[in-house]
Amino acid sequence: VMLAAGKHVACEKPLAGTLEDARAMADAAKKAAKKGVKTFVWFNYRRCPAVALAYKLVREGRLGRILHVRARYLQDWGGPQTPLSWRFQKKVAGSGAHGDLNAHIVDMARFLVGEEVSEVHGAIERTFVKERPLPGKKGETGKSDVDDVVLFLASFAGGATASFEATRLAIGHQNDNGIELNGEKGSLRFSFEDMNVLELCEGGDARTGGWKRIMCTSAGNHPYAANWWPDAHVIGYEHGFTNMAADVLRTLAGLEPEVPLPDFADAYQTQRVLEAALQSARQRRAIKLSQIK
């Protein structure tokens, strides 16, 4: 409705609760785009300075051809003691860790690699906690029917292999949104639990090789750093949302964002990967993305 009325739209991720709804939204956005209407999806982790720097390094060819991707999003707040809420009810949330967490890391992997996923296989979906305490009702429980864990393997169009894992039952991991890329010339890795740091390892002289930690807080050298505090002063979770909002406003003003913003068409590709993973888990076979329309 808003797109048809010519309004720019920013949407939470994932794009929709179902593939069909996501497709309808992407189609509506494509039609509205012909009239200059823009869409955005709130994949805020792209706006972390370290992730934006990783994007730039990959585009500069510092890693060479990407061979492997390992992505994870591990949290520990969803144990059996956690009271029932909308997040654990499929009719409201749509999915559990898959839509909540895998959506982020699939988007991040696609964003960094710069290619689409071509096939998903080896997927596993589990619901371990099927009853949860009802808030304010001592001794009573309610049904929890979303996935607690979804993990899967994938291939990118250019041949790179990938693994994805999402869970809210990993004790000791509060918000470990992490990714590692291995290329022919180097590797990089990031974890949101150390969000101001990007780790980089470039091949070459074995005497001086190895991982180095880059504090992404230098104005003029690191994305978004000039917008905040003096050099070496770190930022936090909330600053990613501000960076996102700033890039949206820059785009609406006709300026370039620091790094590309996901629109409905982009987010629909992530939704297709999520759907392929669920089909792979339930059918116990490989699913080509060409099958997911």
Regions found by a protein language model. Give the residues of each.
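Beta-strand-loop-alpha-helix segment that lines the small-molecule cofactor/substrate pocket
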Residues: 1-46, 61
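Aromatic/hydrophobic pocket-lining residues that form π-stacking "cages" and hydrophobic walls in ligand
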Residues: 25-28, 54, 276-277
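Predominantly a Rossmann-like dinucleotide-binding segment in NAD(P)-dependent oxidoreductases
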Residues: 35-40, 45-144, 198, 284
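Glycine-rich phosphate/pyrophosphate-binding beta-alpha loops
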Residues: 103, 165-173
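C-terminal glycine/acidic-rich active-site capping loop/insertion
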Residues: 111, 133-145, 151, 155-158, ...
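Short acidic/polar mixed-charge low-complexity motifs
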Residues: 158-160, 169, 184-187, 285
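Stable alpha-helical structural segments in soluble proteins, enriched in small hydrophobic residues
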Residues: 236-240, 244, 274-283
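C-terminal lid/capping helical subdomain adjacent to the catalytic/cofactor pocket in oxidative enzymes
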Residues: 268, 282-293
